């Protein structure tokens, strides 16, 4: 395999390798967040709070449907990274071919489910009648383009699996800028409304996916499968599906809990809906360095697991945890003082109730970010080792916790219950992952 300007993760100093690999992922994640955040900012400023609430009311469904497809792709990428670490080029090509086939089938499945169930689901969740039609137009557009989303995440995942986290960043920057320009053009010039924000997102992601494919074809052609590797391999497909569906289901279970939580938020009115979407957008940016480190540790562990370097895996997880804890403390302190101004900037609103509620959400939840950091790092570490059940069990803890809050806490505490819901659930989730990780680490190091 020809190696060009890719970070070496299976030998050498761990900290520089993780940082070098994580930094482009961080920048990619920032621009990925700009997709939805630019939608929120532009919709809020030019279409008003009602339209902003319409977009916000779909966020949980968006995460459920699109997150499933992306989770499956990321899960199968772990198998690809493992084959790369083991220097098994033939199996690597077969894995890419099988992943593409599975991705096409799953994309069609998601589109079908969306066509049948989106509007009833919005109604079931208690989406206010004043915004339900706008919500449907936006989320239906996103779901119909899920194949484009999967294609980009697959291509970017392939590059990251072989240590090239920088290339996808360049394409994503172009796409993010294009998304903002299209949002502004469609909304302010063509007056297409909320739906145009979804259209702009899909067009931008499609361009990013095409650029990624062209790059792979020219620079890393060994990733491209040829015709003879498109063959039925029962063991390979089972391995890819089990790993992919485990991550996809994990994401979906988390998102189902978020959908249930969204149903409670929808009962609190459009101001709270808008406050929640603004706060969540800010939180998404705040934890991006943590998720970037976690993404890098998944690839790091997958490659080193394939190379059977278990002591290096232990050191990598320790370093990743320390890095994420330092960031968590810094960003929590920052959010405590800047939440009101950030909320006003993101939402485009001067509504004091909206700003106060969103700020309270950020100031309280950020105190729990060190716990969230360990949760994300350990879950990704276990996924990198190919452990499917433990992260899935962790997701069930989150699901049942959110159901408990929606049924018995939020009806009595209002938005404060929403604020405390996830942070308090992170605690048992993290404890479970710590226990399992230490047990598996001991087994690997004593074999």
For each feature predicted by the language model, list its residue ranges.
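Transmembrane helical elements of multi-pass membrane transporters/channels
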Residues: 20-39, 141, 152, 175, ...
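Transmembrane alpha-helix boundary and packing residues in multipass membrane permease domains
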Residues: 25, 29, 41, 78, ...
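Alpha-helical transmembrane segments of multipass membrane proteins
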Residues: 37, 112, 154-158, 180-185, ...
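Small-residue-rich hydrophobic transmembrane alpha-helices
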Residues: 52-112, 149-168, 262, 276-339, ...
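Short runs within selected transmembrane alpha-helices of multi-pass transporters and secretion channels
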Residues: 73, 141-160, 168-176, 197-210, ...
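Helix-terminus/linker motif at the lipid-water interface of multi-pass membrane proteins
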Residues: 30, 34-53, 122-129, 185-192, ...
